[in-house]
A protein has these predicted regions:
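Beta1-alpha1 glycine-rich phosphate/pyrophosphate-binding loop at the start
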Residues: 2-78, 169-193
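Residue-level detector of alpha-helical recognition elements and their boundaries
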Residues: 33-37, 46, 84, 126-127, ...
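Short glycine-/acidic-enriched loop or helix-start segments at secondary-structure transitions
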Residues: 18-19, 43, 88, 122-124, ...
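Short, mixed-charge, low-aromatic patches
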Residues: 21-27, 43, 96-104, 155-160
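Predominantly flavin-linked oxidoreductase catalytic cores and closely associated redox partners
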Residues: 130-199
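Conserved phosphate-binding and hydrolysis motifs of nucleotide-dependent enzymes
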Residues: 10-15, 116, 158-163
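FAD-binding core/adjacent interface of flavoenzyme oxidoreductases
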Residues: 1-9, 62, 67-155
Length: 199
């Protein structure tokens, strides 16, 4: 029998940071990572710069690939796999392979849930239409970049940091960009004097 088993749900920056720290503290730890998307070990803050072309390839957003996490850190990494149930009494998770539909269980001694943030989607008619995107995953960035290559104009809903970075990068690609912010100023989470600098 090996060491204790750590299951991490979410293979982006926070989840892998926790997994790496735990593995450094206990080298015998068996680490299993589940990621719903196809990419691991990336920070979503780079997505606007990928859309704008400053970061040329999607793989350049990634610090370590799933294969590198396996070979260099000894992690078991399941991409395109979603954890659909946590059985706390039996200390196992049920995972679904999103490519073939199969399910399997993974036992754990410790569990980290690092599924990241969710975009706030305003109740606007048409938000589920083609050409409407959120900015969360590498796959989102690829879809936005592909669409931006065929577009002349873009609307960005949200005047926070990510929204402004995305608006800037789309404008640098030559798109006419309109920003919509529900509150009375851009960068509403920052002090008002910062908002005035970008208005």
């Amino acid at each position: 029998m090996g060491g204790k088993r750590l299951v991490v749900i979410g293979g982006t920056a926070a989840g892998l940071s926790a997994a790496s720290k735990a593995k450094r503290l206990d080298g015998s730890l068996e680490v299993t990572v589940f990621e719903r998307g196809g990419y691991v070990s990336y920070g979503s803050c780079g997505l606007p710069y990928f859309v704008g072309g400053m970061i040329r390839e999607a793989d350049d957003l990634v610090s370590l690939t799933a294969e590198e996490l396996r070979s260099k850190r000894g992690f078991r990494v399941h991409t395109h796999t979603e954890v659909v149930r946590i059985d706390r009494a039996r200390k196992l998770v049920e995972a679904k392979d999103l490519e073939n539909g199969g399910t399997f269980d993974a036992p754990y001694d410790a569990l980290v849930i690092a599924t990241g943030s969710r975009p706030i989607i305003p109740p606007i008619v048409g938000m589920e239409s083609r050409g409407v995107f959120t900015v969360r995953s590498v796959e989102d960035g690829i879809a936005i970049r592909d669409r931006a290559g065929k577009a002349r104009a873009a609307c960005v809903i949200g005047g926070g940091v990510i929204g402004l970075e995305m608006a800037e990068q789309l404008a640098l690609r030559g798109l006419k960009v309109t920003i919509f912010e529900a509150l009375d100023r851009l960068l509403p989470a920052f002090p008002e004097e910062h908002s005035r600098l970008v208005a």
